[in-house]
Structure formats: structure tokens, C-alpha cells
Design a protein with these regions (language model features):
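Nucleotide-activated sugar donor-binding and catalytic core shared by glycosyltransferases
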Residues: 1-144
């Protein structure tokens, strides 16, 4: 998958995490090839692409959204209700082709204001869901 990303983004300053050099301020894209880093990295990101949306079903889309990031993922997101809801709100994007990805992702790279706006919408959505466990607990306890 990383080779596909490297090919697709050829021409945009990019590096794999394991090959990064601290003195690379011109980087626009960092491909994460190490486990256990995402939560911390989302804090410094502008946009997130969440994996497994082309295979088994998208991974956690709430984590980057909670950090105020617009979220991208592949077409297999039936396992994530929040992904569906964020698509409806316009702060998350399911992509199924290179053309679809280009038409949605590249404008955000070129428009930081729009990126921040969509990220704020994603974060507001997650915050609006914060009391879901309080609503579910009585239902769970009532069925024990």
C-alpha cells in the first residue's frame, strides 16, 4: 500500500516515517510505516487517511476526527456508523479511485482554511457523540 501512495503522491514532498529526518520542514506528506504512532501524530496533522477501507473495513475514524482533522478512507466503511455520519456532514470522504481521491484530497492540501473548517466540523461531530455511553448504559443494564 505504501508503494501505491508513494507513486500517487510523486512530486509532493513526502517521506516514510522510518526514513524521516528532523530537518525536513518542506514535507507535506508523511507515510506512517510504524505501529503505535497515530494518536500522537494526529495532533500535528492537517488531514488523515485511515486505512483498511479497501480491505477488511475502515479502522478508527473517530480518533483523527476528535483531533480536528477531515478524514479520508476507502469504500469499505460499513463497520463504522460514525464514518457514514461524517460523510453526510461533509467532513469525511470515502474514496474509491485515484480520480475521486485527487478531486477531494488535493483541494484540501491547497486550501488550509477549508481544511480547518472541515476538521472543526469533524471534531464537533465527535464531541456531539460524547454522551452516547450515558444513553446506552440504561439499555444495557436493563437487559442484564
Amino acid at each position: 500500500h505504501l508503494l501505491h501512495a508513494e507513486t500517487f503522491f510523486r512530486g509532493i514532498p513526502m517521506v516514510r516515517w522510518k526514513n524521516r529526518d528532523q530537518a525536513q520542514p518542506e514535507l507535506r506528506i508523511v507515510l506512517i510505516d510504524t505501529i503505535g504512532l497515530l494518536a500522537g501524530l494526529y495532533r500535528g496533522a492537517d488531514i488523515a487517511y485511515v486505512g483498511a477501507g479497501f480491505t477488511t473495513g475502515v479502522h478508527n475514524t473517530m480518533e483523527p476526527a476528535s483531533m480536528g482533522l477531515p478524514v479520508f478512507f476507502g469504500p469499505r466503511y460499513d463497520n463504522a456508523l460514525e464514518a457514514k455520519e461524517m460523510i453526510e456532514l461533509g467532513c469525511a470522504f470515502s474514496i474509491d479511485s485515484t480520480e475521486n481521491f485527487e478531486s477531494r484530497f488535493l483541494p484540501l492540501l491547497q486550501n488550509p482554511e477549508l481544511t480547518r473548517k472541515l476538521g472543526a466540523q469533524a471534531q464537533q461531530f465527535i464531541e456531539s457523540q460524547a454522551h452516547a455511553s450515558e444513553q446506552c448504559l440504561p439499555l444495557i443494564l436493563g437487559n442484564l
